[in-house]
Amino acid sequence: LYWEDGKWVETKPLEIHKPLTYPEVGPKESYLLHHEEIESLVKNYPTIKRARFWMTFGQQYLTYLDCIQNLGMSRIDEITYEAPLADNPNEKVKVKIVPLQFLKAVLPNPQDLGENYDGQTSIGCRIRGLKDGKEQTYYVYNNCSHEAAYKETGMQGVSYTTGVPAMIGAMMFFKGLWRKPGV
């Protein structure tokens, strides 16, 4: 889902992808996804002609997603499972589970994986438009080392770049700094 010419355009999951080059990271296969941030952008800047969100995934991750989907484990509806009792395998009990919630319960907590992350995130915004009658393109970005983020907070870079700016914004708001001109 992305915004173009005043309307939302729907696509199939991971249908649109292409290599994009990220500063200090290099080229990565990038996938067009929906993200809440573009909803906020088009609401607050109604003259935007196109707003899209791209994200990268490693091939192994995409293979895991395909496997989870193919096994029916990405379902969010409740199913009934007939399970043998631990103390009496011959006796069975019917248990209701939501497959995706079950996966969440048995897979490692993402918070516990940060120590093994390496490399860096690269989050940016490419802005293209007219300024003084001439087409201009700007790219504002932030890179974050997973290792440095983990050393500082015990979290990997994606969590760091999500949580730290929100915390700083909240702190500035409550100290009255956010309301000053230019902020």
Whereabouts are the PLM-identified features?
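C-terminal catalytic/substrate-binding lobe primarily of soluble NAD(P)-dependent oxidoreductases
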Residues: L1-V183
